[in-house]
């Protein structure tokens, strides 16, 4: 209700360790099944940091020195010095409170206001001390230097960028090289495919002083948050191993497939394998409660199977080695 009525809104700095301690001691009130701790009754738990109107991104620099706050309705991004923030907390350097939560003095905790452009939202980092902030209103990404605070470059985005991600760009050791703008609108960047359209995400080369747009590709509407990580960090399984499938209705031999009845309840144990289901058919009575358990017995990567049942809005997809059930 009060959003955008004042010069600044707030970022909440939460001492999660203190919250953890309070929760362990049984502090808090159960509301709708969730334990809620009132920060106004627990001094030192939450502090308010004034920030530009409608704060969106709150991002920490790789060295942990700066907290970068971006208010969507202000043309600057604010760099808060974390040491100064902690000093202000210790010294009770407040300008008042909001609902019992102390407000840190803005001038005591900020190092700079960086004039990045209109509609700043989120910030990512490179390994060389540069930061990259998305500009929703300007439809651009601003590149600026931590510590000296000058904006050194901008690259247009098409269009209305929201989030962005650079290679491990919100970690303690960003890789640099590549950045992706996750745009909210595409507006003709692709052939028209109807009322529901993909949005344009754009790959940017950040290896040089000047950023360079190198590729458009298309994602689901309203992309939010993404990560770029080294490929060798991803070590997924490619099939669910047979010996690890502990589903009570899993079967691996066609002789175990079939339907069993218990009163008006029917259990169908089914096998899926290239390219058939066993059993291929079964009969039930009107009013029966039917449970189908399908095991994809493939142990070859990428050999998934699907089962759809007309008129019941049922669609199952089983990955290799997986069992799924549905009751209707």
Please identify what each model-predicted range represents.
Residues 1-260, 265-267, 302, 327:
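Predominantly soluble domains enriched in secretory-pathway, periplasmic, or organellar proteins
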Residues 248-328:
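Extracytoplasmic copper-binding redox domains, predominantly the cupredoxin/blue-copper superfamily
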């Amino acid at each position: 209700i009060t959003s955008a009525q004042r010069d600044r809104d707030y970022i909440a700095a939460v001492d999660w360790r203190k919250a953890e301690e309070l929760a362990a001691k049984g502090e808090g009130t159960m509301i709708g099944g969730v334990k809620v701790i009132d920060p106004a009754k627990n001094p030192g738990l939450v502090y308010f940091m004034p920030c530009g109107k409608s704060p969106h991104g709150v991002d920490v620099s790789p060295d942990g020195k700066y907290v970068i706050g971006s208010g969507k309705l202000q043309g600057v991004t604010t760099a808060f010095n974390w040491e100064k923030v902690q000093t202000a907390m210790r010294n009770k350097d407040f300008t008042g409170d909001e609902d019992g939560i102390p407000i840190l003095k803005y001038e005591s905790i900020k190092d700079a206001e960086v004039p990045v452009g209109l509609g700043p939202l989120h910030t990512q980092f490179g390994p060389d001390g540069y930061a990259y902030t998305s500009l929703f209103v300007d439809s651009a990404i601003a590149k600026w230097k931590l510590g000296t605070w000058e904006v050194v470059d901008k690259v247009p985005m098409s269009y209305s960028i929201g989030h962005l991600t650079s290679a491990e760009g919100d970690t303690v050791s960003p890789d640099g090289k590549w950045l992706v703008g996750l745009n909210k609108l595409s507006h003709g960047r692709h052939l028209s495919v109807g009322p529901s359209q993909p949005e344009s995400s754009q790959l940017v080369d950040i290896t040089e002083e000047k950023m360079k747009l190198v590729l458009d590709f298309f994602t689901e509407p309203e992309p939010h948050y993404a990560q770029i990580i080294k490929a060798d960090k991803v070590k997924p399984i490619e099939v669910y191993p047979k010996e690890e499938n502990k589903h009570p209705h899993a079967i691996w031999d066609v002789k175990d497939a079939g339907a069993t009845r218990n009163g008006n309840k029917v259990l169908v144990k089914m096998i899926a394998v290239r390219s058939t289901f066993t059993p291929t058919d079964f009969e039930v009575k009107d009013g029966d409660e039917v449970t189908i358990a399908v095991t994809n017995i493939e142990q070859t990567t990428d050999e998934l199977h699907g089962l759809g049942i007309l008129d019941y809005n049922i669609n199952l997809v089983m990955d290799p080695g997986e069992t799924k059930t549905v009751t209707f």
